Regions:
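Short, well-ordered secondary-structure micro-motifs within conserved domains or adaptor modules
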Residues: 37-62, 66-71, 192-196
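Short loop/turn segments at strand-loop or loop-helix junctions that form parts
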Residues: 5-9, 70-74, 121-133, 161-164, ...
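A short, gly/pro- and small-residue-rich
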Residues: 54-85, 144-145, 206-220
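Catalytic donor nucleotide-activated moiety binding site of glycosyltransferases and closely related
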Residues: 7-11, 144-180
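Leloir-type glycosyltransferase catalytic cores
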Residues: 81-122, 137, 221-270
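A donor-sugar binding/catalytic signature common to diverse glycosyltransferases
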Residues: 53, 180-225
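N-terminal pre-catalytic "stem/leader" segment of glycosyltransferase-like enzymes
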Residues: 1-47, 132-133, 267-270
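Well-ordered, non-membrane alpha-helical segments in soluble/globular domains
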Residues: 16-22, 140-153
Length: 270
């Protein structure tokens, strides 16, 4: 099996580090991974590791092969952990994590971060994503209409939380106010968090705040509301299996380097 780890020509440190860890992990399994800054039309790898969907779109038309997408993870610390999934971003990827055991959750994440359900917050939180981001690339986003619909559907104030990295990409969304604090503070005080498919849904579910999401790329798609019909009385499903499954989407660099991640992901080829 031939596996290539693609990094951009500028060789960003996080991409190179992920590629080196992945190649080290493959070596533990008797496989060789090659790091490359170029993927041509005659490329013959069976699998290409790429960081981010921009690189995936660069590579896939040329290689016509599967890709394994490395990205920021879902449970914190998102900059320490790396998510690894086949052929898609977030919930569009394949992680082979359905009905996972709870060992990874208990080992790494069962530290009190999963709070009891508490749908009694003082406002509805609308979290914005970056305009043009890959996660909403094919979704018809109209945040102003969504804010208007929310205000009609609830007596609670609707607060808008802009994306912390790039603010203002959607202009000024008219609602009942804005939330300028951290996402952790924002979801803790909300009755419901409303998002297209952002990771604020994960933060919210962990905080015990129900979520409305509108796109199946969301990592809380299976346990969140899909529309506004239950906004005033949200369901409170068991989150145990969701937490166990999500723990099998992300890996520490050292787990990748010793082959633990590939031990799980290689089942695609068995």
């Amino acid at each position: 099996m031939k596996i290539t780890c693609y990094v951009r020509k500028t060789r960003p440190k996080h991409q190179v580090a992920a590629a080196e860890s992945f190649c080290a992990g493959l070596k533990r399994h008797g496989l060789k991974g090659e790091i490359s800054t170029k993927i041509g039309p005659d490329h013959e790898s069976d699998l290409v590791l790429v960081w981010g969907m921009n690189n995936a779109r660069t590579v896939r038309p040329r290689s016509k092969k599967e890709f394994l997408l490395a990205e920021r993870a879902y449970f914190e610390d998102r900059h320490e952990w790396i998510s690894l999934g086949y052929n898609g971003l977030n919930n569009r990827g394949e992680y082979y994590n359905l009905n996972s055991p709870d060992d990874r959750w208990k080992k790494h994440f069962d530290d009190g971060r999963l709070q009891p359900w508490n749908p009694n917050g003082k406002y509805i939180l609308l979290t914005l994503q970056i305009k043009g981001d890959n996660s909403i690339r094919n979704f018809p986003v109209d945040y102003q209409k969504l804010a208007d619909d929310l205000r009609k559907a609830t007596d609670l104030p609707v607060l808008v939380k802009d994306h912390p990295v790039r603010k203002g990409t959607w202009g000024n969304i008219q609602a009942d106010g804005v939330f300028n604090g951290s996402i952790e503070e924002a979801v803790r005080g909300a009755a419901v968090t409303v998002t297209i498919n952002s990771n604020s849904g994960v933060d919210s579910i962990l905080a015990g705040t129900p979520v409305v999401n509108f796109d199946h790329g969301s990592m809380v798609w299976d346990i969140a509301m899909k529309d506004l019909s239950q906004l005033s009385d949200p369901p409170l499903p068991d989150r145990t299996q969701w937490a166990a499954d999500l723990a099998y989407t992300q890996w520490l660099p050292k787990e990748i380097a010793v082959g633990e991640a590939w031990e799980h992901l290689k089942q695609r080829y068995e």
